Swiss-Prot record:
EC id: 5.4.2.10
Binding site for Mg(2+): 101, 241, 243, 245
Necessary cofactors: Mg(2+)
Catalyzed reaction equations: alpha-D-glucosamine 1-phosphate = D-glucosamine 6-phosphate
Cleavable signal peptide: none
InterPro entries in the cross-refs: A-D-PHexomutase_a/b/a-I, A-D-PHexomutase_a/b/a-I/II/III, A-D-PHexomutase_a/b/a-II, A-D-PHexomutase_a/b/a-III, A-D-PHexomutase_C, A-D-PHexomutase_C_sf, A-D-PHexomutase_CS, Alpha-D-phosphohexomutase_SF
Membrane spanning stretches: none
Organism (species): Listeria monocytogenes serotype 4b (strain F2365)
Gene Ontology cellular-component annotations: cytosol
Pfam (any one): PGM_PMM_III
Positions of post-translational Phosphoserine modification: 101
Protein name from the UniProt record: Phosphoglucosamine mutase
GO biological process, one term: peptidoglycan biosynthetic process
Length: 450
């Protein structure tokens, strides 16, 4: 990670860390790096989620883009994967999404996509960072006809919805689907998509007001949708995050079906159809041990990466794999889109239900999970957790006690000032005890003093 760019673009508290001034400079520097070889007036798409700070940052970013001669097409509120798809579909030179995904409303972020719809490489981000840190801005400052322009392309939402419908062979007639849009970017997309697929719909978290994104709803709060599914007697529930690149499912009896299980279900189905490239799925080190045991029983190969959907996508492209993702709900179907896509993943999952005639609880039960606990600890300097001798000592002690029947993962978050402690063990009691033992040391050594 660089000075400005984390694992998912530039993020920070809006108007104090991620300021309009920084957004303007990101527009100038990022726009220049991504379009300098394109020719006169390259086209860049700009979109945002529903945060109150979105319009402020959008205005500043667009000003920066226009100042280096870029033609901006403004998409309005749309999901991150919608932007990625439309970048290629519209032949744009690049695109920018303004969102902090699942983070609280005070945060916001800016992430770029290249003309191929993929997130930027480390080299591209490093070049933008070098320009940001240059004492004097010497980039072109055209005038008159050399300036860029701004136009709206709000109909891009419908084009994206129509594309998603083409990725499956079934409609959803006869299914009652509960949707939780996290008061975010899928609020204006999900109900239209599933209505077009002839499903019966109940929705929550679909009334954004600028302040309620991810607030007790969405993929980071699946318990809200679980209660909603039971109340509405739905066949399945889908909870998206603020920018729509994640999904967590709920089965008909209110159980959470996380990204691991969704990937497992879809991998099994794709393999049966002869559609799983190289008989391999890509996941991160956060996936449950039960996920890997289940894949082994199915004789499906797996490739593990560091945490972050960008690393999953990199491995998928390198190995020509078409399915990968994260336990958190970032799932990439590379045959259909270039990034995690909650809506796409949701319809692929329900398509498997329709094709097999099985309930989601039946499909999910085919993968057994190890008890797992995750603690997020706010710290003063997340990057030194692996260097702390007391933290290393307690991890070693726990791993020795596990004797191979479990695992520990302690790592810095790529997007927030947190250390994440994840433990899996044979029983829930052991998992809780080991996780608390390690977390206590991390808190003692590194936690912020409130």
């Amino acid at each position: 990670m660089g000075k400005y760019f984390g694992t998912d673009g530039v993020r920070g508290v809006a108007n104090s860390e991620l300021t309009p001034e920084l957004a303007f400079r990101l527009g100038r520097m990022g726009g220049y790096v991504l379009t300098r070889h394109v020719g006169e007036h390259p086209r860049v798409l700009v979109a945002r989620d529903t945060r109150i700070s979105g319009e402020m940052l959008e205005s500043a970013l667009i000003a920066g883009l226009v100042s280096v001669g870029i033609e901006v097409m403004r998409l309005g509120v749309i999901s991150t994967p919608g932007v990625a798809y439309l970048t290629k579909a519209q032949g744009a030179s690049a695109s920018v999404m303004i969102s902090a995904s699942h983070n609280p409303v005070d945060d916001n972020g800016i992430k770029f996509f290249g003309s191929d719809g993929f997130k930027l490489s480390d080299d591209q981000e490093e070049e933008i960072e070098q320009l940001l840190d240059t004492a004097e801005d010497t980039l072109p400052r055209p005038s008159g006809e050399g300036l860029g322009t701004v136009s709206d392309y709000f109909e891009g939402k419908q084009k994206y919805i129509q594309y998603l419908k083409q990725t499956i062979e079934n409609d959803f007639n006869g299914y009652h689907i509960a949707l939780d849009c996290a008061n975010g970017a899928t609020s204006g997309l999900a109900t239209h998509l599933f209505a077009d697929l002839d499903a019966d719909i109940s929705s929550m978290g679909a009334s954004p007001n600028g302040l309620n994104i991810n607030d007790g709803v969405g993929s980071t709060h699946p318990e809200a949708l679980a209660a909603f599914v039971l109340d509405k007697k739905a066949d399945v529930g889908l909870a998206f995050d603020g920018d729509g690149d994640r999904v967590i499912a709920i089965d008909e009896i209110g159980q959470i079906v996380d990204g691991d299980k969704i990937m497992f279900i879809c991998a099994k189905y794709l393999r049966e159809q002869g559609l799983l490239n190289n008989n391999t799925i890509v996941s991160t080190v956060m996936s449950n041990l039960g996920f890997y045991k289940g894949l082994k029983e199915l004789e499906i190969e797996d490739v593990q990466t560091a945490v972050g959907d960008r690393y999953v996508v990199e491995a998928m492209r390198e190995g020509n794999y078409n399915l990968g993702g994260e336990q958190s709900g970032h799932i990439i179907f590379l045959d259909h889109n270039t990034t995690g896509d909650g809506l796409l993943s949701g319809i692929q999952l329900i398509n498997v239900m329709k094709a097999t005639g099985k309930k989601l609880s039946e499909l999910a039960a085919e993968m057994k999970t190890f008890p797992q606990k995750l603690e997020n600890i706010r710290v003063s300097d997340k990057n030194h957790v692996t260097d702390n001798p007391k933290v290393s000592k307690v991890i070693g002690e726990v791993e020795a006690e596990m004797a191979g029947n479990g695992r520990v993962l302690v790592r810095p978050s790529g997007t927030e000032p947190l250390v994440r402690v994840m433990v899996e063990a044979a029983t829930k009691e052991e998992t809780d005890e080991y996780c608390e033992r390690i977390s206590a040391v991390v808190r003692s050594e590194m936690a912020l003093n409130d």
